[in-house]
A protein has these predicted regions:
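Hydrophobic alpha-helical bundle architecture
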Residues: 169-184, 385-389, 393-397, 403-412, ...
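Short amphipathic alpha-helical coiled-coil/interface segments
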Residues: 31, 35, 39-42, 46, ...
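Extended amphipathic alpha-helical segments enriched in small hydrophobics
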Residues: 219-244, 251-255, 391-429
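Acidic/polar, glycine-enriched structural segments that form the non-catalytic walls/loops
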Residues: 1-99, 103, 116-117, 174, ...
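Composition- and surface-driven signal marking solvent-exposed, interaction-prone regions
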Residues: 8-21, 122-124, 239-242, 246-247, ...
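Aromatic-rich carbohydrate-recognition surfaces in CAZymes
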Residues: 24-38, 81, 92-206, 213-238, ...
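Short, glycine/acidic-rich hinge or "gate" loops at secondary-structure transitions
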Residues: 9-17, 45-61, 176-180, 201-203, ...
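Extended glycan-interaction surfaces of carbohydrate-active proteins
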Residues: 58-91, 115-148, 194-218, 259-394, ...
């Protein structure tokens, strides 16, 4: 029932309200008849929200960003299923398809409107997933099966498995878990067969991700997602009394590799690897930017494929461990090492003033006398000549992710420090407090 076979390629999107109201007069009539109830519910939420004891900067940040739910970034088609842009302009949407790795960072909807959030999982696993487990990380609108002619996104697909665990816990319905379980297993098996074919517990084959490139070789960022996905799947499978021996062995290997091969003593890094893999030469594989000039070929031999981060300190270098926490999973990776990574990010990547920071990318996100959390830095040297393309930028989504993770680990003041730095940029004088744009 999740694939509407009546939808044709030529069909246009029909919004949810069109299934409830024939015209604006019916909307107005409903509003008038239910005004008192709607007002009471609105005031109840508002009063409860602002009764919080959270610090003012956190309340402001959450309140401002919750308004996105009432913007054209969020669509809901006629049957109630949700579909989202990454953001929106005055007359257009920005980056279509409820992008799985982008929406990993959004945690409001599953707690405010859990039924709507579950429709995202149902689209990802029932509609946008092929029989071999490949998941298209951008879904079609109207929601319908989509062509599978590009990479799956490792962070989006693995993150989706953790979010199934979260949504099941919020819902509390085992029947929903039983319905989606085989699709989740198919998805995870695809991830293993495609990116960890040697069953090392490591994502090492080239894998697409939120930076719009492919990482080659294991990284703290993606392997933390892998660890979390395995942990979530083992927990769901054991609840359903399945034999999880194979997946638990992979989970143990994944944790061991994270802690002993990707941790440099201070933070988690990437081991760039492009030889002795199942994937072909980096110049030949499908990629957004796979063209190599003569200079690029020289760099390939010297540093490896373009657009990696190597020995850098990546701000979301343990983002999978953060997602595990917010999804309700226990900490699997050594907490002291995770905290050390986060403290390193705060130490090296948080800049109070960006006037001397060179950013050849999208510099308007944060510039001049503003502060911000850089996506990556190389405090110990080893910066690649062609690092991943957004490395010098500042993204609010990652600022909040790192800040909240620091708070989870007990470093509340350092987390608030990042939040304040972010919100200082969006104080209404130069930037719109309701528009922390990234795309």
């Amino acid at each position: 029932g999740y694939i509407d076979t009546s939808i044709q390629l030529s069909d246009k999107y029909r919004p949810w309200y069109s299934s409830r109201f024939a015209n604006i007069e019916e909307v107005a009539d409903y509003w008038m008849k239910n005004y008192n109830t709607l007002k009471e519910k609105t005031e109840l939420f508002t009063d409860a929200f602002y009764a919080t004891t959270l610090p003012a900067e956190v309340v402001e940040a959450v309140a401002a960003n919750l308004t996105i739910l009432k913007s054209p970034t969020i669509f809901r088609q006629y049957d109630g299923r949700m579909w989202n842009w990454e953001g929106c302009g005055n007359e257009y949407g920005s980056c279509y398809g409820s992008c799985t790795h982008v929406w990993n960072y959004a945690q409001a909807i599953p707690h405010l409107f859990p039924k709507m959030e579950r429709t995202l999982r149902e689209t990802e696993f029932f509609v946008s997933q092929a029989k071999n487990g490949h998941q298209a990380f951008r879904s079609a609108l109207p929601i319908r099966p989509i062509r599978h002619n590009f990479h799956a996104a490792a962070d989006g697909q693995l993150g989706g498995i953790m979010k199934v665990y979260r949504d099941w816990h919020i819902y509390g319905n085992d029947e929903w878990l039983k319905l989606i379980y085989s699709y989740v297993q198919n998805s995870l098996d695809y991830c293993i067969n495609t990116w960890d074919p040697k069953r090392k517990g490591v994502i090492e084959e080239p894998h697409h991700n939120t930076y719009d490139i492919e990482f080659w070789g294991p990284s703290g960022m993606i392997n933390s997602y892998y660890t979390g996905a395995l942990q979530a799947f083992v927990a769901m499978g054991e609840h359903l009394e399945k034999d999880m021996t194979e997946y638990r062995e992979l989970l143990d290997k994944s944790i061991d590799y994270m802690e002993n091969q990707l941790y440099d003593g201070e933070y988690f890094i990437q081991n760039i690897r492009w030889k002795e893999l199942q994937a072909s030469d980096p110049t030949k594989v499908q990629s957004v930017n796979s063209n190599y000039s003569k200079e690029g070929l020289d760099l390939l031999e010297k540093e490896g494929p373009k657009y990696q981060y190597g020995k850098g300190c990546l701000s979301d270098g343990v983002v999978g461990a953060w997602l595990s926490l917010v999804c309700g999973l226990d900490e699997a990776i050594d907490r002291k090492k995770i905290l050390s990574h986060l403290l390193s990010v705060h130490k090296y990547n948080l800049k109070r003033n960006l006037r001397k920071h060179v950013n050849p990318q999208r510099s308007t996100f944060a510039l001049g006398d503003e502060g911000g959390l850089l996506l990556c830095s190389w405090p110990k040297g080893g910066k690649l000549q062609l690092p991943f393309v957004y490395s010098n930028e500042v993204w609010t989504g990652i600022e909040y992710q790192v800040a909240s993770h620091l708070m989870f680990e007990g470093e509340v003041e350092k987390g608030l420090d990042i939040v304040r730095t972010c919100r200082d940029r969006y104080d209404g004088r130069v930037r719109n407090p309701f528009n922390e744009y990234e795309c």
